[in-house]
């Protein structure tokens, strides 16, 4: 196996859910493409890396300083849904039910993997909560909206597994002194599962019956 081939396989194998065998198949498939198409693919990856960053408020993927969700005045500013990853945010958006804002933690507490609270975007979340209590802007840099005096609700939508449960419990504890309403998705999601794989109907019910 050539060094170039091996190196390319190693990069694809770094992708979540892609093992060495799958990575090898992908590279073999790419080698079957016309060179012009491979060049277009590589340019697309470069454009992605240079043109996509993280939203300054919620850490969703965005081509601008703020993502489309945070920039949308029609979203409910008094609700912030906490998710572990951008893919979880995408799954919730697909339901079409939730119309609030988000906060992407960047993972879940997992001491075994070296992910501690300080490894996540928890400080940024607390700052958003503080800013909301002061001026009702949910931590954004925009001006307060006239008449917006609703109570802030933090929806803990971490994955229904050990790491997600640990993270949700930790967040509940540190948010208590801030006197904000917190809610959890209703039971019904399979234990040990991941939000990004839950079907839309189940996710809709979990949101409707949150407590």
Descriptions of predicted regions:
Residues 23, 72-133, 150-158:
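Extended interfacial segments that mediate partner engagement and assembly in macromolecular machines
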Residues 25-56:
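Short, charged low-complexity linear segments at domain edges
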Residues 44-89:
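Cys/His-rich short segments
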Residues 13, 31, 46, 59, ...:
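Signal for well-folded cores of large energy- and translation-related assemblies
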Residues 34, 98-99, 126-132, 151-211:
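Long C-terminal interaction/binding lobes of large macromolecular proteins
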Residues 140-149:
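Short Gly/Ser/Thr- and charged-rich N-terminal loops/segments
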Residues 1-16:
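Extended, structured, electrostatic nucleic-acid-contact surfaces
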